[in-house]
Structures are given as structure tokens and as C-alpha cells.
């Protein structure tokens, strides 16, 4: 049901932030050996919990399919959707408020080397596996039509099914955002038998989405994302969060040591940025831990 009144108050009373995400793509949202939710998208949820509740563990992750993303955020039953969600104007109008692009991705293709091709333009008449209810599916159709490739799409509801179909040879190629291809490909038994083709056929700006109808909550989540980015820009990392004046006006303002960037107007604590950065680190730390050297080892090109 849609929430009456302030979502921030509701979250504080509830004592946790509810995020719709996933557990099937390493780097973005998966389970570690102990069964904990980990990943880039999960850390964005933890950052919000740190800011609002002072506790990065005060989260509930609800796993949803790609095709369930719109209805889930429209219903207002979750506080935030963080599930590799591409910003589009129609989704922004119909689903919820896109907060900020936190990763710039682009769609690509992975194929088995035995197919003997080196370009996506050679996929004439091919069968390509893709997830339902995604921009990926729409882009594939556009790419096929534009280049007269007559590609057949084989669609599945969830990523695991797409990967299984590709690995069992039901399709010639598998298409997804390039970072997800790298992540999922890293888990293949014979990784070296597969190549990601050079073409990037779309722009995929990924970021969190919040329900329509609560500007305060939208602003809070936007501010949390900004803290991650500015923390890195100002050289503040999880291991070096000062609690007394540094003499650097911008750092002191961000950390709530001196001055303000408007925390009190938003209803978050003066030192919320300290809580966020201590708990999850800055943008670069989150990237490196999940998508970079500590995770799926994706080079940080135009990531943010």
C-alpha cells in the first residue's frame, strides 16, 4: 500500500530500510559464503541505512525478478529499488524517481569462441538469450532490426535461467550489460572458451529508484549517493574519517564538523556522512570491493 505521511519517519519507526534487489549476479547482488547479501547495489542500500538509522545492517533485501521491478516500486512496498536498474524517461514517469546514476554501463554480447565470430554484426539469424522485462530485450530487437540481422530472442524470467540456457547451447549468444556479462562469465566452468564481443549497443545508466510521492525521501537518498561520490573526491575513506576539524572547509562541512549542507532540513543527523563513510566507505571503495579488484575485477573506465 502507498505510504501516508513521511517515508523517513516510517523507516525510522520500522528500524530498517527495505530494498528490492537480487542475489544472482556477483558484484551487484549475490550471497557470500556465509549467506550474507553482498554487492554494489546492496552497499547502496546499506549506505542509506547508515545515514537514516546509523546501522548498515538495518536492511531487508527482497529478491525480485527484472520484470517485477516496476510493480514493486510503484506499489511503494519497498523504500528503494537497487537492482541494476537502467534509467529511462518512461520508467521515471511510470515507476518511481530515479535518484542518481551510480554506474554507467552498456549492453554487449558474450559468445562461445567455437561460434567463430568476432563481432555482434555477425550474429545474423542467431538465437540470443535475454532476460524478460528489461531494456536489454528492447535494445536487442532494435539492434537486430537496424542491422537486418533477423536475431531470434529466447527470453527467460531470471538471470540464472538465461545463463543456464546459454551454457547448455540453447542460444548462440547471451546479451546483458557488459559488467554483468563479465561478472556472470567469471563463474563459467571454462571461462576462456567464451568471449565478450567488442560492440556496446546501448547506454545503460544504472542507479537506485525510490517511490513517487515523497520528495523528502527522494532528497535523502540522493544526498546519501552524493556523500559517497564527494567522500571519494575529498579523499575521505572508511579508514580515515576525521571527527574533528581538518581545516578543509569542504571536508568539515560534508562530515558535519563545521557548517552544514542542509542535513537538518532533510531530517538526517548532522554527522550522517561520517556514519555512511565509516560503514560502507566512499564510492571508490564500494566500486573496488564489488566491481573492481576485490570483486569481479572490472576496470573502472567510465563507471562514475
Please annotate each region the language model reported.
Residues 46, 50, 54-122, 181-200:
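Acidic, polar ligand-binding/catalytic clefts
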Residues 251-304:
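C-terminal functional modules
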Residues 12-16, 49-57, 74-78, 114, ...:
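Sec-exported extracytoplasmic/periplasmic mature domains
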Residues 24-27, 66-69, 80, 86-90, ...:
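Solvent-exposed loop/turn segments at secondary-structure junctions
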Residues 1-2, 42-46, 50, 113-117, ...:
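Extended ligand-binding regions for polar small-molecule ligands
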Residues 18-27, 37-52, 86-87, 104-163:
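Bilobed "Venus flytrap"/periplasmic-binding protein-like clamshell domains
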Amino acid at each position: 500500500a502507498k505510504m501516508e505521511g513521511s517515508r523517513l519517519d516510517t523507516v525510522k519507526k520500522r528500524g530498517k530500510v527495505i530494498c528490492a534487489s537480487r542475489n544472482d549476479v556477483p558484484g551487484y547482488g549475490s550471497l557470500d559464503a556465509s549467506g550474507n547479501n553482498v554487492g554494489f547495489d546492496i552497499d547502496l542500500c546499506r549506505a542509506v541505512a547508515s545515514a537514516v538509522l546509523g546501522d548498515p545492517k538495518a536492511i531487508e533485501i527482497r529478491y525480485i525478478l527484472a520484470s517485477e521491478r516496476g510493480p514493486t516500486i510503484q506499489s511503494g512496498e519497498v523504500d528503494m529499488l537497487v537492482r541494476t536498474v537502467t534509467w529511462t524517461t518512461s520508467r521515471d514517469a511510470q515507476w518511481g524517481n530515479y535518484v542518481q546514476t551510480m554506474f554507467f554501463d552498456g549492453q554487449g554480447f558474450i559468445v562461445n569462441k567455437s561460434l567463430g565470430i568476432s563481432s555482434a554484426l555477425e550474429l545474423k539469424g542467431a538465437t540470443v538469450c535475454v532476460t524478460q522485462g528489461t531494456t536489454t530485450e528492447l535494445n536487442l530487437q532494435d539492434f537486430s532490426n537496424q542491422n537486418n540481422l533477423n536475431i531470434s530472442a529466447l527470453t527467460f524470467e531470471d538471470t540464472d535461467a538465461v545463463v543456464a540456457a546459454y551454457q547448455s547451447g540453447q542460444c548462440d549468444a547471451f546479451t546483458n550489460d557488459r559488467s554483468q556479462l563479465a561478472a556472470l562469465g567469471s563463474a563459467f566452468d571454462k571461462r576462456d572458451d567464451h568471449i565478450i564481443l567488442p560492440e556496446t549497443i546501448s547506454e545503460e545508466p544504472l542507479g537506485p529508484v525510490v517511490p513517487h510521492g515523497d520528495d523528502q525521501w527522494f532528497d535523502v537518498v540522493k544526498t546519501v549517493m552524493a556523500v559517497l561520490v564527494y567522500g571519494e573526491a575529498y579523499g575521505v575513506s572508511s579508514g580515515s574519517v576525521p571527527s574533528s576539524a581538518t581545516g578543509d572547509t569542504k571536508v568539515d562541512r560534508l562530515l558535519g564538523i563545521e557548517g552544514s549542507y542542509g542535513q537538518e532540513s532533510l531530517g538526517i543527523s548532522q554527522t550522517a556522512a561520517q556514519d555512511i563513510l565509516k560503514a560502507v566507505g566512499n564510492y571508490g571503495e564500494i566500486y573496488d570491493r564489488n566491481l573492481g579488484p576485490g570483486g569481479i575485477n572490472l576496470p573502472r573506465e567510465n563507471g562514475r
